[in-house]
């Protein structure tokens, strides 16, 4: 399985970041980890002393995504988090909403994430896995992974990644505290309980979804149990043709857990100091408001 790509980052920087809290980064459909590393260059620069960003490759080969070949045409192979039918253009396929109607290969997604986690551990990184970050299709998968974790925690199930990492000899476990979602479409994908969870247990069969244990009152759990309540930062380009679908993902989240950053851009990652700084400011606000002492930017 493909894993993370750190070739685009100076080795010295990654050595300095070994102790920092880690964020797992999921690229958009029709790109790959190497491309996403480059697309996040401005964000990485502002977070160099705060977080270690680790970029995972998706499991499925695909055609290039929108506007990818004009800049990164020689950076293939291109990948997708969901299987795209052979010979089908990924841009037209996604625009038609086909990704919502297919069976998601949860095992393949989980294997890629486990490979990225294990490889970064082998590189000597020791920081906690504290967050997810994704763009477009990767943002949708990141939010869906966070929601799966929320269901597992509410039911007292073993998290997928901890069980899988143990099998692979890795030392990490994941307890994601937030996600940063750039241009992510709703609704959430059904990722089940993951290949390493206790999906067949009586607890799993007795409850479909709920909020993180201990984070809300019983009344709030009953009212918002179907919503993602782990904190999310949603970054929307106001000139993105898919903006309304991105706002649909916001509606899948509990309002009090959501922060929104809007910028004057299309369907791409922000790169200016001002626009990226607004995202970093929200991360800082999240760390302070949630009293995440180790996550202060």
Curated annotation (Swiss-Prot):
<dbReference type="GO" id="GO:0005737">
    <property type="term" value="C:cytoplasm"/>
</dbReference>
<dbReference type="GO" id="GO:0016787">
    <property type="term" value="F:hydrolase activity"/>
</dbReference>
<feature type="compositionally biased region" description="Low complexity">
    <location>
        <begin position="204"/>
        <end position="217"/>
    </location>
</feature>
<feature type="active site" description="Charge relay system">
    <location>
        <position position="267"/>
    </location>
</feature>
<dbReference type="GO" id="GO:0044550">
    <property type="term" value="P:secondary metabolite biosynthetic process"/>
</dbReference>
<dbReference type="Pfam" id="PF03959">
    <property type="entry name" value="FSH1"/>
</dbReference>
<dbReference type="InterPro" id="IPR050593">
    <property type="entry name" value="LovG"/>
</dbReference>
<dbReference type="InterPro" id="IPR029058">
    <property type="entry name" value="AB_hydrolase_fold"/>
</dbReference>
<protein>
    <recommendedName>
        <fullName>Probable esterase afoC</fullName>
        <ecNumber>3.1.2.-</ecNumber>
    </recommendedName>
</protein>
<comment type="function">
    <text>Probable esterase; part of the gene cluster that mediates the biosynthesis of asperfuranone, a probable antitumor agent. The polyketide synthase afoG is responsible for producing the 3,5-dimethyloctadienone moiety from acetyl-CoA, three malonyl-CoA, and two S-adenosyl methionines (SAM). The 3,5-dimethyloctadienone moiety is then loaded onto the SAT domain of afoE and extended with four malonyl-CoA and one SAM, which leads to the formation of 2,4-dihydroxy-6-(5,7-dimethyl-2-oxo-trans-3-trans-5-nonadienyl)-3-methylbenzaldehyde (compound 2) after reductive release and aldol condensation.</text>
</comment>
<comment type="similarity">
    <text>Belongs to the LovG family.</text>
</comment>
<feature type="active site" description="Charge relay system">
    <location>
        <position position="136"/>
    </location>
</feature>
<keyword id="KW-0378">Hydrolase</keyword>
<dbReference type="GO" id="GO:0005634">
    <property type="term" value="C:nucleus"/>
</dbReference>
<feature type="active site" description="Charge relay system">
    <location>
        <position position="240"/>
    </location>
</feature>
<dbReference type="InterPro" id="IPR005645">
    <property type="entry name" value="FSH-like_dom"/>
</dbReference>
<dbReference type="GO" id="GO:1900554">
    <property type="term" value="P:asperfuranone biosynthetic process"/>
</dbReference>
<feature type="region of interest" description="Disordered">
    <location>
        <begin position="204"/>
        <end position="226"/>
    </location>
</feature>
